[in-house]
Amino acid sequence: MTNADPHELQKFSDLAHKWWDPNAEFKPLHDLNPVRLSWIDAHAHLPGKRVVDIGCGGGILSESMASLGAQVKGIDLATEALGVADLHSLESGVSVDYEAIAAEALAAREPGAYDVVTCMEMLEHVPSPANIVAACATLVKPGGWVFFSTLNRNLKSYLLAVIGAEYIAQMLPKGTHDYARFIRPSELARFVREAGLQMVEIKGIAYHPLAKRFALSNDTDVNYLVACRRGA
């Protein structure tokens, strides 16, 4: 049974044609991308590394990592989004290998094949995030890096990420997030530990509405990033 929610896949497929419009529904991802890219690169030193981007969608992060000199594979089960990613890669001249395959299936096929695994803004959209974390741990080489980002589950995150971002500021389409699937850092830490990974750093992501920009923060109450390593 595939670890995917058909409703979630359809939701992102319906918006596929807007992935690369920096002023449309995916504007927050475009604004966030430089922050997460520089954070990932600071840890993993991307040039020359073999990377798999799980839940890559339209390829915003995948392409930016490839632009830094990484050899990137992007996987997703939203085939319309992958089609957009493929087309944009051809237009930009930035080479990324895209494939419609589940993380668990790729892990079974290519265990220990990647220096870096990224799984950003994806765990809160699947029925079993622990299985995705385990697949990431299988995919990464000993000594390699695994990066996650997701949303904390508390009243503040509900008010800011759901009510604020989707209904008041309208930064995101209504229904983008299901609060019940948000993941507390302690829960993600348990998934990471059970998968045999070591958590190296956790950082929050703050949004500054007046400047309309994202920045790293020590506040993990809403959006947060986690860097992990597999033992050598």
From Swiss-Prot:
Lineage: superkingdom: Bacteria
MF GO annotations: 2-polyprenyl-6-hydroxyphenol methylase activity; 3-demethylubiquinol 3-O-methyltransferase activity; polyprenyldihydroxybenzoate methyltransferase activity
Pathway per the UniProt entry: Cofactor biosynthesis; ubiquinone biosynthesis
A GO biological process held by the record: methylation
Catalyzed reactions per annotation: a 3-demethylubiquinol + S-adenosyl-L-methionine = a ubiquinol + S-adenosyl-L-homocysteine + H(+); a 3-(all-trans-polyprenyl)benzene-1,2-diol + S-adenosyl-L-methionine = a 2-methoxy-6-(all-trans-polyprenyl)phenol + S-adenosyl-L-homocysteine + H(+)
Keyword S-adenosyl-L-methionine among UniProt keywords: yes
Pfam families: Methyltransf_23 (PF13489)
EC assignment: 2.1.1.222, 2.1.1.64
Keywords of this entry: Methyltransferase, S-adenosyl-L-methionine, Transferase, Ubiquinone biosynthesis
Binding, S-adenosyl-L-methionine: 36, 55, 76, 120
Purpose: O-methyltransferase that catalyzes the 2 O-methylation steps in the ubiquinone biosynthetic pathway.
Homology family: Belongs to the methyltransferase superfamily. UbiG/COQ3 family.
Entry protein name: Ubiquinone biosynthesis O-methyltransferase
Organism, scientific name: Burkholderia mallei (strain ATCC 23344)
